[in-house]
């Protein structure tokens, strides 16, 4: 602040950076195959220390966001913070990286602690591809999380990643029908190939993953002198491995074009439910799947509850079948996954998973090891 001046800090700096932990608690369990985090051993500050620091920052800089520098926020962070601080108004608006939450109430807790910008580890909506990545989440959980976060007014920034050893065309082909249906959901910031990083399992376990002919990026030849051991200095590598997406350039180009359209037309898309009284609800629908033509649906409360609640396909009703016909939900991992957004209070009232015992969905960590 002293270097740039108080005026610059007051007018131009919107966010402060804060560290509450180091390492990655998920990597301690099952490191994602593309993750290049070098340090190991997750450790974190005590919650009372974090709370004390946040209170100080809020008091000293009341108009600033606080962005956590943590690679991943501590497991159960929001609930623990709420338990320690009933009055969430004392907290500044927060930003953080985190693992996808399975349940709606967990996203509601994020909203309650003033989380405004989050970077969730989405990466894909294909559970098979997520298992290849060792992500510890599923396609249905990722999509459900994005729908819930957007309904709660939380901005998400995420990426979709392609190009993994052994991947198949069908692990990407589904995006051709999914993207037009979710054009109202905030799009990914990146649609990019997985990179081979030195400290990632894709490098450290290259042989076991079927990756051969590892070589450092040629740009290192322009950075270091000839005598330098560039293979030891480099962090970025290339390698050969079987991958159907690399063998399907026409599909990749089509998906890239769809993602661009998603980004360009997201703001004109909507799929939103609101109450109009007397147990009736109006759905406004303008998405890519309908050519951005506005459609309206009037539904009664029982149907609205079914539409808004994730449900195993074996337990689905005629209401779910109707919702699928209208593309108000999709089927992922043999689950009906709702796509319709709503204001947070209405969502919490209609989504029955918010009032029932939390849904016991199988985790990718479980299915990976089965």
PLM features: residue spans?
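A structural motif corresponding to the C-terminal lobe/cap of the Radical SAM core domain
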Residues: 88-90, 97-272
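Short, ordered beta-strand-loop transition motifs
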Residues: 272-280, 331-333
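Short amphipathic alpha-helical interface segments
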Residues: 278-317
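A short, conserved structural fragment
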Residues: 320-336
């Amino acid at each position: 602040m002293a270097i740039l001046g108080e005026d610059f800090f007051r007018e131009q700096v919107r966010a402060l950076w804060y560290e509450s932990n180091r390492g990655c608690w998920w990597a301690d369990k099952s490191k994602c195959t593309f993750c290049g985090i070098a340090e190991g051993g997750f450790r974190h500050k005590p919650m009372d220390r974090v709370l004390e620091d946040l209170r100080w920052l809020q008091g000293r800089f009341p108009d600033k966001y606080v962005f956590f520098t943590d690679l991943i926020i501590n497991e159960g962070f929001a609930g623990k913070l709420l338990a320690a601080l009933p009055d969430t108004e004392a907290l500044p608006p927060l930003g953080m990286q985190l693992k996808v939450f399975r349940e709606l109430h967990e996203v509601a807790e994020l909203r309650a602690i003033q989380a405004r910008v989050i970077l969730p580890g989405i990466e894909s909506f294909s559970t098979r591809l997520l298992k290849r990545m060792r992500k510890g989440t599923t396609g249905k959980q990722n999509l459900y999380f994005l729908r819930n976060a957007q309904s709660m007014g939380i901005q998400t920034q995420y990426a979709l990643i392609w190009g993994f050893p052994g991947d198949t065309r069908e692990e990407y082909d589904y995006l051709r029908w999914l993207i037009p249906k979710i054009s109202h959901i905030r799009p990914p910031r990146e649609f990019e190939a997985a990179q081979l990083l030195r400290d990632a399992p894709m490098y450290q376990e290259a042989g076991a993953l079927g990756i051969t002919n590892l070589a450092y990026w040629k740009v290192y030849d322009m950075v270091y002198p000839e005598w330098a051991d560039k293979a030891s200095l480099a962090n970025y590598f290339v390698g050969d491995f079987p991958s159907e997406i690399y063998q399907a350039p026409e599909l990749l180009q089509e998906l890239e074009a769809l993602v661009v359209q998603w980004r360009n037309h997201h703001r004109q898309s909507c799929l939103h439910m609101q109450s109009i009284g007397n147990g009736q609800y109006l759905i406004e629908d303008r998405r890519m799947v309908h050519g951005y033509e506005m459609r309206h649906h009037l539904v009664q409360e029982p149907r609205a509850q079914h539409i808004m609640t994730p449900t195993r396909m074996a337990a689905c009703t005629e209401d779910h079948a109707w919702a699928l016909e209208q593309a108000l939900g999709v089927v992922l991992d043999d689950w009906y996954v709702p796509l319709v957004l709503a204001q947070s209070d209405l969502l919490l009232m209609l989504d029955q998973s918010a009032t029932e015992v939390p849904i016991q969905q199988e985790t990718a960590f479980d299915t990976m090891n089965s």
